[in-house]
């Protein structure tokens, strides 16, 4: 039950793959959801108001 250097060597599997909708390497292999565009979770593209720079 260690959480140090010895357990870090066991991390070998890929968590994220390339998304086929947005192309970024953000598609979670286990949940099959893209954290960048929302593919697999919603049919619309994932966007938020806080992503854009403020005009003033």
Curated annotation (Swiss-Prot):
GO terms for molecular function: rRNA binding; structural constituent of ribosome; zinc ion binding. InterPro entries: Ribosomal_eL37, Ribosomal_eL37/eL43, Ribosomal_eL37_CS, Ribosomal_zn-bd. The keyword Coiled coil does not apply. Binds 1 zinc ion per subunit. A zinc finger (C4-type) spans 19-37. One of its GO terms (biological process) is translation. It comes from the Archaea. HAMAP family: Ribosomal_eL37. Binds to the 23S rRNA. Belongs to the eukaryotic ribosomal protein eL37 family. This is Large ribosomal subunit protein eL37.
